[in-house]
């Protein structure tokens, strides 16, 4: 196990910058906002933690990348900044949910609401579903698990992929079902199944896992992470952060839902929200039962309670 701890001087430079204009921008934050952002610089800080690498299969040792500080982010000419006519995030579902449509549509709505709180100040809308066939995607059946997979070139699997230049991301939640890796997983195809290329009928009435609190939490993580890439946020190397890369499910599970101070400043500089307003919106999402008129379904937020307490500590520090 390895703990990656950066010197305070290095963290301060990554957060605030050495450029005079960016230092002046930083000084525009309120005292409360700076207190939260600078918690990582204090020896008694309670909000942010150093990155822990548990094994060589974790993302950082498996995929070495450069650290990307605020100044590098702000200087990137390709970073995305919302503007008039381009300030909406769209969620497009792919495939039919069949008999599970009622509850799955609620799940998509909860994701939409979370995304709108996370990217506070932007509008998030859902688009009508499209068929898998209409995407023309490549797929395969995993020879070991008999699970159906959408094929991503050069990867054996992905939780999600996003493109800054295209402003688009694709996320899959099948692996977030606790039973996905079990031998009796309900979504397995029959042994020996070999659908022909282009035969998308295999997706008809495909298994939809139950919407649990753990699945919802994992889904919120991957959505916020991949959409972050669309804004130019690269994989975080500084502190525990939702923008850290994840090479496997166990690594993803131990990561936080929150942004570290450096990535938070990057996102805030792009969107322009008040940090307290964003935290309040996220806390409201955690506390809201998520019910919809005429539908008896409570949003399963048990797995989010620790996150809710963290948000409350942030808000208390800013008062």
Protein language model regions, located:
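N-terminal low-structure segments adjacent to metalloprotease catalytic domains
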Residues: 1-147, 274-319
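Metzincin-family zinc-dependent endopeptidase catalytic domain
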Residues: 18, 46, 51, 85, ...
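Metalloprotease/metallohydrolase-associated module, dominated by Zn2+-dependent proteases
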Residues: 163-218, 234-319
